[in-house]
């Protein structure tokens, strides 16, 4: 009987080994690159001023301090505007990859105007460059949006000053015929939130981005994980089985 159980145990181990899904983190040198024109403070484009100054129209806006930091400057007399900022380099589908491929970045949020400011807004996500759709997590609404005008509310989550949010993209191996689509997932303070989102067929290139209002962020694109590791342990990421 003990010998029989031992054989069953050996078989289970072998099956688990066969089902093992190897995953590689794809390191891409990245930085914040551009503020989308529609979301600039005014026609004078004060958001690119160096050194930082207030908007001549009194509007609030986002300013690219350096490669990783976006500082939101509160308005004086005008409106605090939403700012949309994209990273320079996209997450592109790997070619001839025998493993699952993981792309990932994180941002640390700093509230401007006080922790109780009702104007604070932050979205983190990826823009599908093939079909111009946005897949993102809204920390303000505690909701995940799938790019198809559908959202999924995560009612138990809160949004606090100094929270760290992450967005990941996983591509299957090139020869994985039955797993056609990549998926996207989100994290908060080192833990996955919600389920994954399967993407569309036309999904070869994604660009990291954020929407901000009254909220500054510091990004970690994984440029140097030895000195600045992610809060989320990417080495322990398991291929998701549950999706919206």
Which residues are covered by each model-predicted region?
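PRY/SPRY (B30.2) beta-sandwich protein-interaction domains
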Residues: 1-244
């Amino acid at each position: 009987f003990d010998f029989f159980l031992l054989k069953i145990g050996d078989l289970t181990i072998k099956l688990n080994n066969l089902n093992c899904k190897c995953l590689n983190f794809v390191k891409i040198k990245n930085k914040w690159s551009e503020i989308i024109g529609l979301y600039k403070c005014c026609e004078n484009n004060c958001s690119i001023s160096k050194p930082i100054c207030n908007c001549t129209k009194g509007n609030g806006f986002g300013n690219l301090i350096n490669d990783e930091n976006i500082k939101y400057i509160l308005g004086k007399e005008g409106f605090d505007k939403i700012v949309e900022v994209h990273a320079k380099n996209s997450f592109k589908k790997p070619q001839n990859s025998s493993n699952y491929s993981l792309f990932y970045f994180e941002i640390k949020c700093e509230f401007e105007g006080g922790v109780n400011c009702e104007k604070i807004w932050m979205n983190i996500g990826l823009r599908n460059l093939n079909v111009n759709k946005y897949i993102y997590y809204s920390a303000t609404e505690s909701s995940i949006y799938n790019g198809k005008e559908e959202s999924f509310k995560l009612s138990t989550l809160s949004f606090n000053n100094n929270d760290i949010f992450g967005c990941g993209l996983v591509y299957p191996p090139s020869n994985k015929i039955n797993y056609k689509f990549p998926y996207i997932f989100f994290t908060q303070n080192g833990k996955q939130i919600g389920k994954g989102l399967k993407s569309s067929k036309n999904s070869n290139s994604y660009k990291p981005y954020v929407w901000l209002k009254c909220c500054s962020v510091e990004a970690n694109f994984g440029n140097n994980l030895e000195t600045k590791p992610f809060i989320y342990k990417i080495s322990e990421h398991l291929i998701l089985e549950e999706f919206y």
